Amino acid sequence: MPPAHHGSGGRRRPGRGNKGKRDTEAGMTASPDPGYMRPETHAAPSQQTDVRSPASAREHRNADVGVAAPDALTPNAGEQKEVEGVAKVNVAVSSDQPPDWAPSQSDLPPSLSPTTASRPATSSRSPRARSRHSPVASSSAFSSPAPSASALTSASGVPEAPLAAPELKHTLAADEGNPEPRLEGPVERLHARQENPLTDSSDGSYILLEEGESQRACLDRKNRHLRQTTPPGVWTTADLASQNSHSASFASGFRRALLPSGGSGDHDEQASDCRASLRGMQRPCFGSPSTDTRMGAAEGLPLASRRRRQHWRRELRAFGAVALACLRASWHGMKRARLRATRWIDRNAATVRVACYTFLLLVTSTGNTICFKKMIDKMPNYSPCLTQVTTVVFVPVFFALSLYTDYAGGLPQEMADFPKRNFAVMGFLDSFSGVMAIIGAVHTTGTTQVVLQQSCIVFSLLASIVMLRKRFHAAHYLGALVIILGVLVVKLPDLLHPSSDGGGDVFVFNLLYLLSNLPTAVSCVYKEVAFRGVEMGTNYLQAWVALFQFLIGFLVLPLNALPVLGPQRVPLAELPASLWNGTRCLFGFNTIVTNCGGAGNMESPCDNCEGAWKYVGMYLSFNLLYNMFIIFVVKSGGAALTFLVSTLRLPVTALAFCSRAIMGDRAVPPKATDFYGLLVLILGLVIYRAGGIMKRRAQRRAVAAARGHTSSPMMLTPREEEQIGTIFVEEVFAAGELEDGGVTEEDETDDDTSEVEVHPVFSSVVASEPPHVYVHTKRHSHSDGGYHKLPACGSSPAAFTPFTQRMPGTGSESCSRRRNRDGDDERSPRSHACSFDEETGFAGGTGTGRHFSSPGTALSPNRVGGYEPPSMHAVQPAVIGKSRANNGCI
């Protein structure tokens, strides 16, 4: 039996793989009854759906009824009685008890009487009544009411006339004007099952009915999510044929043969009838295009549009799945990367810490320079006030830190006995430098400040030569000359061809800013001398220096009255008023608002004190962080990193001063001379740094030559130097065979073998490089209250100089110290058996078997005649510029 076309499923897509199954099922379900008529094969339904409104659909049905049965609308009384008689006979044949699913008489609405309930339904709305191939109406009077070739047979086998249609007319009328829901569907199914029991085998179609029901049950069990279940106690007019047709859109050939055939227009008409029959009901009609979400189409859309919409939704779901998979993969990748980064940081914690400190030092040093210029531009008329404010803030800060770090565990006696006059000298130098820097920065642009700050290296070189009698490598001098050349490249064009407006730079103020680096350099060298042989706490040092800088600052304020300052000059009588007006400006009150702001720097600028406290606070914050990260970098990575930061800060700060986003209206237009000058300055800094490296190599060659080492000094490893030079250091310094000539940065930052330590010091002004002080070898306290260290370039004291001599009358050598700290002799009968001096670090004997007999050395007899106080051999902090007679070191 060829399969009939589904009314709502449309044409099947190729490749479903059930064509053979459909043919097999069609052959198995052939009816054994010779009177059974095989349904005719209709043409394939059109793909275009007949879109009609509910009103037009009703008119179309009325027209069809009028054409099919023109005289059936006025039946006579005889036909009506005959129909009622046939209905009574059919009811009598059925079972006495209705099935369990049948509704009781109380559940039916009042409009349906028992007579109406027992009357066969003839509505043309039902697809089962409209199709002559319905398996439910196999051999009963529930076939199509329209005239057809297959006539209905009664119980006696005589063909009957088609059923009259008074109920049809009533149904149409109710459809048009009655808003109540129609309930003929369940009643029709009730009578269909009562009048067509399974024992009715008039045409043998009960086989189709039974197999169709079993197939439907199997399909419903497999596709439970497609079924619309009715809650118990609720009686709805679910269209059974419509449910089956939608729940089995891709059923087998046997299933499609059982379902009624029809075009796509039948489905739309059926959906319209279903909506009309459920007018006023809460539950939507299953199978209608507007509510059938499984079809994925709105009312009236053709099948092609519905399929396109389904494809679009599938593509959207696929895209969402791909996006979700990408997000999950990215998340897992980020987790793995974070885990690997954490492991790498754990393995290289020291390197990461030093890198972070160096980067933060670069940021804070750049911010310190920029905020200094912005603060000066905000309060240009109150240099005395800014000088004191930027100093007094740090006094309580560093005293609090010193109290926490130094006084908590008890202040060391060495720090308590350190002369406070040395702090006063340092404070005077720093205060003098700060006043000159703030006055000069008023009419010095940002890029010019960056260039002039590098002159501090040249001044430090000169101060070390004069005060420390220190010798430098030739590369140091060459680097200093290149730095001077870079400064001239930047400033020489302005000196030769000065502009009318000055471009923000005034020569006198530039010169003052340049000379402010000289006291800074002298202060650093003085601190190196003052703390030689003394271990000083950094916070304790900075607290006292800041205090003296603030107090002495009042004595240095008369520098603001210099006549060369022009409009920026503050007479001595007006200094107190200037301090008070500066304090008012700090909180936003303007004072100088008249006779100001003239062109050509002929008048002082007008006050613009709004928000001045913000810029002062920013500068103080960056300055404090800058000094803090200097300490971290020096302790973690060494002073060499501070040189790297100072070099990198040049181009970064110059670009920041040229940026209008950072400096606003005070941005400096970039010039070619500034760019070339920065390149020359960077080259000079690199050469100067290379001089320190070359000097260290020269010292290592000298040590290897004095040691008698045959191999190249450049091939010595730190382990070899430690093994060979344990006793050699004693010999070298005792015999005075090596001169210090200064200590390089590499030796200063080595925690294991260095003889000096670098301690950063506080600076309230902008310096070219982080200021620091060299603190030499550790202290050695004695009973007389003095403090002694082995000077880096001097002989050791006689009381702590071991030497070797032959005992009289014996052939053995004994190690002896003529006088120890208590004045008693200390001898040992064994060769090289002198005890290890824990304070000086000297071994008991020379260990080399060599004897030094040159006069003036530590082994000379005139050096061991008695105990000499250590203070005679230690460099006094207050003595500057005096050299030792024996080797020229201070």
Curated annotation (Swiss-Prot):
Sugar-modified residues: N581
One GO process term, biological-process aspect: amino acid transport
Keywords, sorted A to Z: Amino-acid transport, Disulfide bond, Glycoprotein, Membrane, Transmembrane, Transmembrane helix, Transport, Vacuole
Gene disruption phenotype: Enlarged vacuole compartment. Disrupted endolysosomal system. Reduced growth rates. Slower invasion kinetics. Reduced virulence in mice. Impaired secretion of microneme proteins. Reduced transcription and translation of several endolysosomal proteases. Decreased bradyzoite viability in vitro. Reduction in cyst burden in mouse brains after infection. No significant effects on parasite replication at 28 and 40 hours post-infection. No significant effects on parasite egress from the host cell.
Membrane topology (UniProt): Multi-pass membrane protein
Family designation: Belongs to the CRT-like transporter family.
Region entry Disordered, spans: 1-163, 280-300, 798-871
InterPro entries named among the record's database cross-references: CRT-like
Gene this chain is encoded by: CRT
Low complexity bias spans: 102-126, 134-156
Vacuolar topological domain: 373-391, 444-447, 493-505, 566-614, 664-673
PANTHER family associated with the record: PROTEIN CLT2, CHLOROPLASTIC (PTHR31326:SF1)
Listed Pfam families: CRT-like
Compartment(s): Vacuole membrane
Keyword Transmembrane helix (UniProt): yes
A GO cellular component entry from the record: vacuolar membrane
Composition bias, Basic residues: 8-19
Organism, as annotated: Toxoplasma gondii
Name of the featured protein: Chloroquine resistance transporter
S-S pairs: C585-C609, C596-C606
TM segment ranges: 350-372, 392-412, 423-443, 448-468, 472-492, 506-526, 545-565, 615-634, 641-663, 674-694
Cytoplasmic side: 1-349, 413-422, 469-471, 527-544, 635-640, 695-890
Function, as annotated: Nutrient transporter. Involved in maintaining the osmotic homeostasis of the digestive vacuole. Required for the proper organization of the endolysosomal system and, in turn, indirectly for microneme secretion and parasite invasion. Required for bradyzoite viability and cyst development.
Claim: Nucleotide-binding is one of the keywords in the record: no
More about this protein: Can function as a drug transporter. Can transport chloroquine.
Primary site of residence: membrane
